[in-house]
Amino acid sequence: MDGILILDKSPGKTSQKVVQEVKRILGVRKAGHAGTLDPLATGVLPLCLNEATKLVQFLSLDDKEYRATMLLGVTTETMDIEGRITDRREPEVDEVRIREALQFFTGPISQEPPRYSAVKFKGRPLYSWARKGVDIALPPRTVQVYSSILEEIALPYVTFRVACSKGTYIRTLCADLGERLGCGACMSVLRRLRCGCFTLETAVSLEDIADGKGRETLLSRVIPLSDGLRNVAAIEISEELSGRIRDGFQPDGSTLREYHIPSLADGDMVKFLTSSGGLVAVARFLYASDQLAVSDMGQPAVRILRVFHDRA
């Protein structure tokens, strides 16, 4: 079983724990997830099975979309409702101020990784240092918040929908919004609605998998490797070239000119497919596609990033 299964994660388990359970239930040899969800969080968690685990490095780069609820007036050491409370303040806010705060944290913003997170320092996740009482301050990172839409105010709770780049911590965003509002805040609910092109509409629950009911229906939900990178341009190649690439060949301009090449800029990613739709490789173009005709003969036109042995 090679492919991607979109899971609607339940609260209470780590993403890695979910992966281990899916491996056991489905009997797959390898599995991995793209985009960690905290135990508190629910929603879209792409699970990559067997050969599809090679796609994790690409799927993890995708933008995300969430629905979050924050509790105003309460600050915790973990920035979510499960952590030890460190401060309480009365939230004296209105809709205008809340909308202003959401707008303030839209666009490129700077975030420090939470002390209780899976980000590694000296090979160990930050939460392991924090539990030992060691406070590690990592440099801030710039992330992108594309939109923050207010959905509901039921003080002290505020619910909003946010679309953002990879690496954005919604816990940190809630805490920063609380400080902007002058009362502090922590995240109380988080649901991921989208990860790249994957949404809840195609998701299954762990309970669906564990029940074993409708196994054929479940297997029909497994997304082929070639569909895992839907936003990446595709080039269909011959079986002969597929074999050469899988043996380590880096195609040059003269080789690629034999095929239909979509419009690509220098640095764009591309996926090579067989005529039957099997994923051969993911590569990065070293020239714009309109420069292939004048590229150095015999010099690679792409850099192969990952090779796949897709049985499609």
Swiss-Prot record:
Alphabetical keyword list: Isomerase, tRNA processing
Enzyme class: isomerase
UniProt-listed SUPFAM superfamilies: Pseudouridine synthase (SSF55120)
Pfam families the UniProt entry points to: TruB_C_2 (PF16198), TruB_N (PF01509)
GO molecular function: RNA binding; tRNA pseudouridine(55) synthase activity
Coiled coil: none
InterPro entries xrefs: PsdUridine_synth_cat_dom_sf (IPR020103), PsdUridine_synth_N (IPR002501), tRNA_psdUridine_synth_TruB (IPR014780), TruB_C (IPR032819)
Gene3D superfamilies in the record: Pseudouridine synthase
Gene Ontology terms describing biological process: mRNA pseudouridine synthesis; tRNA pseudouridine synthesis
Enzyme Commission numbers on file: 5.4.99.25
Active site: 38 (nucleophile)
Catalytic activity: uridine(55) in tRNA = pseudouridine(55) in tRNA
NCBIfam families recorded: TruB
Similarity-based family: Belongs to the pseudouridine synthase TruB family. Type 1 subfamily.
Entry function: Responsible for synthesis of pseudouridine from uracil-55 in the psi GC loop of transfer RNAs.
Protein's recorded name: tRNA pseudouridine synthase B
Organism: Syntrophus aciditrophicus (strain SB)
Higher taxonomy: Bacteria, Pseudomonadati, Thermodesulfobacteriota, Syntrophia, Syntrophales
